[in-house]
A protein has these predicted regions:
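Generic structural signal for well-ordered, non-membrane alpha-helical segments
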Residues: 12-20, 51-59, 85, 89, ...
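Inter-helical turn/loop segments and adjacent helix faces that build the functional surface
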Residues: 68-79
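Short glycine/serine/threonine-rich phosphate/pyrophosphate-binding segments
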Residues: 1, 82-93, 116-118
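Buried hydrophobic positions in well-ordered alpha/beta secondary-structure cores of metabolic enzymes
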Residues: 23, 62, 79-81, 86, ...
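Active-site/ligand-binding loops adjacent to catalytic centers
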Residues: 17-46, 70-72, 98-101, 108-167
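Phosphate/ATP-binding catalytic cores across multiple sugar-kinase/actin-like superfamilies
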Residues: 55-70
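Residues at the starts of beta-strands that form the adenosine-phosphate
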Residues: 5, 103-105
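A glycine-rich helix N-cap at a beta->alpha junction
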Residues: 2-16
């Protein structure tokens, strides 16, 4: 039969961080016959590079479209995107990161959690500390002992307790 086998995650809070953890756990236990690819710029450097490179096509295309429409990159433009795992933000911004901030302003929007919850998944706006998550140093929501906090978000893809090491 064709198609992927979908394996639900029943560990932890059953969110994206747990799915990535289970994926990595399976991969390291089956390295001889398995390869893994993560759809976000998280985890060990090679996965960040693979995902970052593939999503950067979005930025290259945006640059082409801007030049086609305006004959150049506009003198003042804002590029806004959700930040979290990092793939869409990096993909959208990668060709513009080195531009002067006065010309191109990059705006990242972080999803929080439910208003009554203290489990907000917004590491950049909630004083996250540098930590290690999925084999990468990044800003992570963690407790005083360095343990990863549970997080919540209205969006399943934005409940990751850290940000991409690219951020």
């Amino acid at each position: 039969k064709n198609g992927a086998e979908i394996v639900p995650v029943y560990s932890g809070s059953q969110t994206l961080v747990d799915a990535v953890s289970e994926c990595m756990r399976y991969w390291v236990s089956n390295c001889d016959n398995t390869h893994m690819c993560v759809g976000s710029t998280v985890g060990p450097n090679i996965f960040v590079k693979i995902c970052g490179w593939s999503t950067s096509q979005i930025s290259r295309e945006l640059k082409l479209q801007l030049k086609s429409k305006f004959k150049r990159i506009p003198k003042k433009i804002k590029l806004i995107n959700c930040v979290g795992g990092g793939s869409s933000a990096y993909g959208f911004w990668s060709d513009f990161i080195d531009y002067d901030k006065k010309q191109i302003e990059l705006i990242g929007v972080e999803a929080g959690g439910p208003q009554k919850s203290k489990l907000h998944a917004a590491p950049l706006t909630n004083d996250a500390k540098l930590g290690i998550l999925h084999g990468a140093a990044a800003y992570v929501c963690q407790d005083a002992e360095g343990q990863i906090n549970n997080t919540e978000s209205i969006s399943a893809g934005l409940d990751y307790p850290g940000v991409s090491p690219l951020h």
